[in-house]
Amino acid sequence: MIRLNWLFRSSSVLLRSQVRLLHVGDANVLHSEVDKQSAEYKENAREMASLVGDLRNFTSQVLKGGGQKAIERHTSRGKLLARERINLLLDKGSPFLELSALAGHELYGEEVVNSGGIVTGVGRVCGTECLVVANDATVKGGSYYPITVKKHLRAQEIAQENRLPCIYLVDSGGANLPRQADVFPDKLHFGRIFYNQANMSAQGIPQIAVVMGSCTAGGAYVPAMADESIIVKKQGTIFLAGPPLVKAATGEEVSAEDLGGADLHCKTSGVTDHYALDDEHALYLARQIVSNLNLSATNSYNDQLMHSSQVNFQTATPPSAVEEPRYDAEELYGIVGPNLTKSFDVREVIARIVDGSRFTEFKKLYGETLVCGFAKLYGHTVGIVGNNGVLFSESALKGAHFIQLCAQRKIPLVFLQNITGFMVGRDAEANGIAKNGAKMVTAVACANVPKFTVIIGGSYGAGNYGMCGRAYSPRFLYMWPNSRISVMGGTQAANVMAQITEDQRKRAGKEFSEEEAQKLKAPIVEMFEAEGSPYYSTARLWDDGIIDPANTRQILGLSLKAALNNAGQETKFGVFRM
């Protein structure tokens, strides 16, 4: 009996120990409280699915480039389309993270400039992450509109920040002449492309050009300033002035091929280094150049991540070592709806993004409207900052503290934005919301680690700044299709303008009727509604693309992998007003 009791007691102790170990092992797992049978969840899921459907429709349209006739004209010359070229350039089966696919969306009225006339993104070539810029000659002859320049420069900025080799697939007629005032003369116009090339080359970031079509006027400097350049026989041309301008200026009549073709530049001028017989050969040569860059190939994201770009290439398989989230990413549709007045717990979003849905929260009981903590993303430690309401002083102080920790430990930061702004009012001001908010903004601005931002809801006012908006140089910034971005909400802006007008009328001894107020408010609300749209934002490159919420984990993983080529430097903070 005694022995039996001892065995029973021992078994109980062992059982309790196992339960405790299991509990401790799962202590940082986020447990979802989402009710998938609730009316709100189902309504959100329907509405978000509709928004994602719209996104897919818009994306499918831009993939058509300049339209069927332009595509037929282009391919009849034996030329591949821009995205086909990228597909052949990249390692087979590897993902391509296309950026700003909807740049230029409805930006020029009846002029359709799909993808801004240029395809940019990050992909893997011979085991090395590279930044690819490919002109789409089916869109206005590949000419540079203002948005084309902006998108090209943004791609180079990403390459420089993350130390990614640049591969330019050139097929462009140069600057769009009718819009030359917005393309040519200013600091961040066309000339900055070549400035960036020169400086990146000086920093040891390889610059490779593949001339697969026209390369005219200033555009001729893309291959001329590249570390190595390739040109395609009887297809690629490079000249500062084309045949019409040469004839007008000198009276000389010359063909494009004789003026600047592959034979001239490979055999006589020396502008190009490699002679390609066709597009496929040129892309093979480009891969050979990358293979000889003498860069240590990192663990490619092809080995770590499932493909989720906007280009439908083959799917890459993630390794078994990576712990997938415990919850289905498509549940995000039901958690976050288009009605931004309805609150949700950002932890439910985090649980569907990070490895194993594991999240070690920082200062959980303090400043509860800001959620901060550590997690793994494809095996890499990241710090996550997510909104759960308006930012109070306590929230801002907590955020500043956490960002400092990540900067000190060189841990990348992920910001999940759904923010109406900082708290306002007499009590908030008395409690120092201005200086405490400034601490968080300072921390975000100075933290010299890779930062990534996803706008999952609202992005309003100074809250955009505190949560690493575009002005704070996140390495990549994405938006969900339900998101909104404005200095404030349309209704609030309309009420402010109406109040100012009413006060002005009163001082002048005049009345301001309710009818007049409504007449004033309506166009303001309409304007803010239009300009707050994620499509308005992405058309102007205020972000790096609108993404399907269900792909957030994969896209952040691809972005993180690219950024780890330059994991950041020592952080120095300025003065924090105490």
Curated annotation (Swiss-Prot):
Residues 355-388 are annotated as: Acyl-CoA binding. The lineage of its organism: Eukaryota, Metazoa, Ecdysozoa, Arthropoda, Hexapoda. It comes from the Eukaryota. Pathway: Amino-acid degradation; L-leucine degradation; (S)-3-hydroxy-3-methylglutaryl-CoA from 3-isovaleryl-CoA: step 2/3. SUPFAM superfamilies: ClpP/crotonase. PANTHER family: ACETYL, PROPIONYL, PYRUVATE, AND GLUTACONYL CARBOXYLASE-RELATED, METHYLCROTONOYL-COA CARBOXYLASE BETA CHAIN, MITOCHONDRIAL. This is Probable methylcrotonoyl-CoA carboxylase beta chain, mitochondrial. Carboxyltransferase subunit of the 3-methylcrotonyl-CoA carboxylase, an enzyme that catalyzes the conversion of 3-methylcrotonyl-CoA to 3-methylglutaconyl-CoA, a critical step for leucine and isovaleric acid catabolism. Vital for adult survival. Its EC number is 6.4.1.4. Residues 321-570 form the CoA carboxyltransferase C-terminal domain. InterPro entries: AcCoA_carboxyl_beta (IPR034733), ClpP/crotonase-like_dom_sf (IPR029045), COA_CT_C (IPR011763), COA_CT_N (IPR011762), MCCB/AccD1-like (IPR045190). PROSITE patterns: COA_CT_CTER, COA_CT_NTER. It catalyses: 3-methylbut-2-enoyl-CoA + hydrogencarbonate + ATP = 3-methyl-(2E)-glutaconyl-CoA + ADP + phosphate + H(+). Expressed in third instar larval ring gland (lateral and medial secretory cells and corpus cardiacum cells) and CNS.
